[in-house]
């Protein structure tokens, strides 16, 4: 049974709609629905993950782990869990609403984008992940899709979401479960070896690589061949895409995408690298090259995974401008439905923590030479 999680117990409510005004369905997960809602007391907009308790049977451990992790976290660059309610046969996780859209979308929309912009983004990610690591938490699924902008403001901060695969390290225990997203997972995970916080640092290196060229360091249609590349840590800084990128940026990436986890930079070491802490990140506009590669390698496939993130951002703009009229165009459900793909995660507006998906397990097809 759910309940044996760290942190305060959740609150009881006879009817959650007495507390929150349910607006729109933002997305549907494996056993949850995500609702854009307004707190009737404060008029604050939130994202509510609505979970049928009967659907959690056999999955209680995963849910308890996620809640326990979220209860421990309070960082300006990490999506927050505000409250938990139990009402009827449902559990309601009240999450901070993140309304600025996804990382890739914002980069593509920009007209000007530089190494320095990428450096500032990675600084925020490193600072947040260092905070997690200091608490003994390993995220285990860091990737661009889990980096969301807090608001529509031009200088909005970035937020880390989706703690469905995160794990708190227990003293004396080792992490060994193969999980994560192919393409971002560290070699030691694929090699089915015990691993540590260093897996997150590898993933940050992969993200930094993509932010500077627009394509992934490892790619193959065949998972086994993809895993072979990752196991060997075989990646290149291809010409012409990397010709205008500084040597400092490449050095930074090499230290994070180091095959040996013992030699790999920690978050603390990465934060001290000149590309982050110094003045070596270049100010040359690389937007055209990077955005073209993002659109070619990521955007379309990503946007097809869920409903159009642009529609959600547009909806949020209307809400912020006060032009959204309550009751107009309502359906029998929760107002204006944004029609997510069945089973797909919510995108853009809601934090991905709200979208409980099946655990992202690696393909069982691993290369033979482990």
Swiss-Prot record:
Residues that bind ATP: 26-34, 49
EC number: 2.7.11.17
Gene Ontology terms: cellular component: cytoplasm; cytosol; nucleus; postsynaptic density
UniProt keyword terms in alphabetical order: Allosteric enzyme, ATP-binding, Calmodulin-binding, Cell cycle, Cytoplasm, Developmental protein, Differentiation, Isopeptide bond, Kinase, Neurogenesis, Nucleotide-binding, Nucleus, Phosphoprotein, Serine/threonine-protein kinase, Transferase, Ubl conjugation
Compartments, record wording: Cytoplasm; Nucleus
Residue segments, region Autoinhibitory domain: 276-316
Post-translational modification: Phosphorylated by CaMKK1 and CaMKK2 on Thr-177. Polybiquitinated by the E3 ubiquitin-protein ligase complex SCF(FBXL12), leading to proteasomal degradation.
Tissue: Widely expressed. Expressed in cells of the zona glomerulosa of the adrenal cortex.
Residue location of crosslink Glycyl lysine isopeptide (Lys-Gly) (interchain with G-Cter in ubiquitin): 59
Active site per the UniProt annotation: 141
Pfam families xref list: Pkinase (PF00069)
A GO BP entry: cell differentiation
Main location: cytoplasm
Family: Belongs to the protein kinase superfamily. CAMK Ser/Thr protein kinase family. CaMK subfamily.
Name listed for the protein in its UniProt record: Calcium/calmodulin-dependent protein kinase type 1
Organism: Homo sapiens (Human)
